[in-house]
């Protein structure tokens, strides 16, 4: 059995150790075992998390993250990873059991993310009796051969995001555009500022659609992952500005920006049951690449 310890905060050595484990898992599996939000919570001073470390023979064998802030539906959210060299020894089951116990102690339900929908995760879910409740598709296309950017609605212009000026407006539009979404709709100005400090942040690739009074109507936040891959990180349009083609224009303008930086491919995330969005992205040349699955008990 592994030695399990809970931590409300991590020291730099623990954070570095966890980062190495996550990198090992991603290299072997071809998919990151945890989402971006978990990586941000590894930073000094980050709050709202319970970190679970599993050690075996003095080695960090596994890591689990419990998001105590949860989603907008009142669920705690869990993600876990097992070091490749420590797999098939029950570490994943021990981590999952401890996460379930921690959620029960808090009197809250918990959801588990399985990134990449890998066989090991689905097997663990089956042993726990968990059911699939969400599937988040990753859709992808090449940046070559993009459709033309359609004209913007009358009176609307595009400009780049300005740090220190636009955070509150982005949060306002985001909350209205994603009021239905368990995670995205909860984004705060502090979340935006935290991501501004990331190496990948590029204000020129954060496109804002504004009216004549500079009131924000929508935005396309792009992200560069490496020398070849970009991401449609978030596209949000105020409900009052929807229906006039602004979302499509913003999406394509962001793709053109990513292509101009020398990238070859782009991906995005979309709920599998959001049929209208899937149809829009399919018409824009995207196709399903892989999926992340969320489980509940």
UniProtKB/Swiss-Prot annotation:
Question: What reaction(s) does this enzyme catalyze?
Answer: 1D-myo-inositol 2-(L-cysteinylamino)-2-deoxy-alpha-D-glucopyranoside + acetyl-CoA = mycothiol + CoA + H(+)
Q: Which domain of life is it from?
A: Bacteria
Protein's GO biological process: mycothiol biosynthetic process
Q: Which SUPFAM superfamilies match?
A: Acyl-CoA N-acyltransferases (Nat)
Cite the N-acetyltransferase domain residue spans from the record. Answer: 8-153, 156-297
One Pfam family in the UniProt entry: Acetyltransf_1
**What keywords would UniProt list here?**
Acyltransferase, Repeat, Transferase
The subunit field of the Swiss-Prot or TrEMBL record says: Monomer.
Spell out the family assignment given in the record's similarity comment: Belongs to the acetyltransferase family. MshD subfamily.
State what protein this is by name: Mycothiol acetyltransferase
Organism of origin is Actinosynnema mirum (strain ATCC 29888 / DSM 43827 / JCM 3225 / NBRC 14064 / NCIMB 13271 / NRRL B-12336 / IMRU 3971 / 101)
Gene symbol of the encoding locus: mshD
